[in-house]
Amino acid sequence: MNTNYPILEIKNLKACINENEILKDLNLKIHKGEIHAIMGPNGSGKSTFSKVLAGHPAYNILSGDILFKGSSILNLDPEERSHMGIFLAFQYPIEIPGVSNEDFLRLAYNSKQKFLNKDEVDPISFFTIINEKLKLVDMSPVFLSRNVNEGFSGGEKKRNEILQMILLDSELSILDETDSGLDIDALKIISKGINTFMNQNKAIILITHYQRLLDYVQPNYVHVMQNGKIIKTGTADLAKELESKGYEWLK
């Protein structure tokens, strides 16, 4: 699906942290119904890119623009961007001691409901909603009573991130190395959740080092990032080429 305007358009974006310029004239267009993979060596700017999209306050925009559904989001804080439909799955999900997963997820869900001028849901109604979503990431309802990410395995933390994405029904999801540290079984579960969630009204950005995630989640485009900009774009075959050749041949 290719709508008249991109769901996300990044124009000549320059961004820095502590006066260190990391993103350098970055350009990218993503339409609804598309999955884009972003690959690149360590230090290429991939994680900075994801945090800048989500509105992380540590990063400063030097020039350029980020348009989401045709409107600039540079002046919006992370919560506003989230309510508009942007979701970031962290590479290293944080633990929140003393807060149950169910309470955390219900708070996030009701916060978005309020933003959309929809009725908030009570705990009983929410349990019915979340129970259906749990099945998509192969998790037991027992998981809801545990504190957020506390004592979770790496795979459980990543599944929890995908669960949040599904629950919030985000239009643009940025998955920052969601596949890192996963065994093959966990990778398959995560991929199933992503593929079930994806449709023609959504777009996903996969940030990854490895081809293996792309064996299960088929991207429409693969971009290579180096030194803060996209230096090459191709199909899923580009990821396979990178797997066999590395990044040196692109220099």
Curated annotation (Swiss-Prot):
GO terms for molecular function: ATP binding; ATP hydrolysis activity. Transmembrane segments: none annotated. Its main location: plastid. GO terms for cellular component: chloroplast. ATP binds at residues 40-47. It is found in: Plastid, Chloroplast. It comes from the Eukaryota. Keywords: ATP-binding, Chloroplast, Nucleotide-binding, Plastid, Transport. Residues 8-250 form the ABC transporter domain. CDD domains: ABC_FeS_Assembly. It holds the Pfam family ABC_tran. Belongs to the ABC transporter superfamily. Ycf16 family. This is Probable ATP-dependent transporter ycf16. It comes from Trieres chinensis.
